Structure formats: structure tokens, C-alpha cells
């Protein structure tokens, strides 16, 4: 079973850069999007054999998530059930027969760490949400989690130490999630591989491969034996992020 996750940094813009062709080529069972930056009705995107679910931010042109699936879910939920967090279109959960699929666009702590305090609250509440699901069925979480966990996960760790996405506080929250019974699938399979999933549009960062790995598939520990592969598709353009992939043995 193939899962794809991609922060498209504006789906309408990405569609103009070949999104539909990439979608079809990747031939996923589940294709999750973050940062769609859309409202309902702005783009009529349908793919044969797929059903789609969308969560839009209240604020226009901001945030937003979507999931395309070939498999009919038992139920779908939007957000995490906490009003403070549920106006930015950041989370969609599909309940399947044997697992929950959660896609997430984690709030960025922003320049000057203006949203770091909010981010810390989000991290704790979102982790509790995942743990509540995990009590019922294994969880597959994917998305732009807006943190490079370890120094290997970004090109310039020393100069970014207190920047959004690589603060000690954000990294500690990710460690806490993993210690709660989850695994970072790519790093589990490839403990020493240096590969990034996001590059700034500035300073020719992508050409220089001065990137960050902030897009993840994180699963419940008990799915470890079913993980066949995890990939980061650095060759695919169309956004400042590239797609990441998880293959699970049924």
C-alpha cells in the first residue's frame, strides 16, 4: 500500500507546474496534501478512482489540507476537536479498517518565534490526539511537521539553532512524540542518510541542496514490521517541498 504526502505550497500554483501528471505517475493508494491555500470551489480537481476530502482554513489563501484516497474510509474527521486549533485547516483523519491515517500541516513558529508559545500548546494537544487514536488502532501520520529533528536533518544546524523549525523546544516535542510509541519511518530505515524535503526559495537553496527534512511519515511503533520502504522524492519539482512516500505491506 503506497502513501504519498506533499506540501504543495499552493495547489493552484502547483497544478500549473504539473501536479496532475505527478499525481497520476505516483499511483498512490493515499495522496495527502498540505498547504493547499484554497477555499472550497476554487479548483475542481478530480481523479478517476479517488475520493477526496478537504479541510480549509477560515483565512483565505492560507494553510489547508486534503487527502485523495482509493479506499473508502469508515469515517472522516477534520481538526483535532479543540476549537483553538481547528480554524486553520491543518488536520484530516481517515479511519480505515486497520489503521488511522492522519495528515497534518503543523503551525510554523514563524520569524522571531512569534508563534512558538502557541506551537508548544499545539504540540501537546496534537500528541494527545494521536495517542487517543493509537489506543484504538495503529496510526499513520504524515505531513509537513515543521521541525528538523536532528542535526542530520538540515544542512546548516549551527546557524539555525534558534530559528523556527530547529529550536530546542520544537525538537524536544518531536522526541516526546517518538518516545510515546511512534517511529520516524525514514530515519528508522535510513539512520545515516542525508536527504532533505524542503528548500528555501531564496539563495538558490535547492540548487545547492541547502535543505531541511521537515516532511515525515510517522507511524505507531507496532507497524514497524510492516514498513517496506520510505522515500523522499527530491527529483520532483512543483513546490518548495518535495513529496515523501511510505510503502506498507498489507
Per-region residue spans from a language model:
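N-terminal, active-site-proximal structural segment of metallo-dependent hydrolase catalytic domains
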Residues: 1-47, 57-63
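Active-site-proximal beta-strand elements of phosphoester/diester hydrolases
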Residues: 1-9, 98-110, 142
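Active-site beta-strand/loop signature of hydrolases that rely on acidic residues for catalysis
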Residues: 7, 23-41, 101, 130-151, ...
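Structured beta-strand-rich core segments of catalytic domains in phosphoester-bond hydrolases
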Residues: 37, 42-109
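Metal-dependent phosphoesterases centered on the DNase I-like endonuclease/exonuclease/phosphatase
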Residues: 51, 122-210, 214
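Conserved beta strand-loop-helix elements of the APE1-like EEP
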Residues: 60-75, 193, 204-225
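Active-site beta-strand termini and strand-to-loop segments that position acidic
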Residues: 70, 94-97, 220-221, 239, ...
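Surface-exposed cleft-lining segments at the edges of enzyme active sites
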Residues: 81-82, 107-123, 158-162
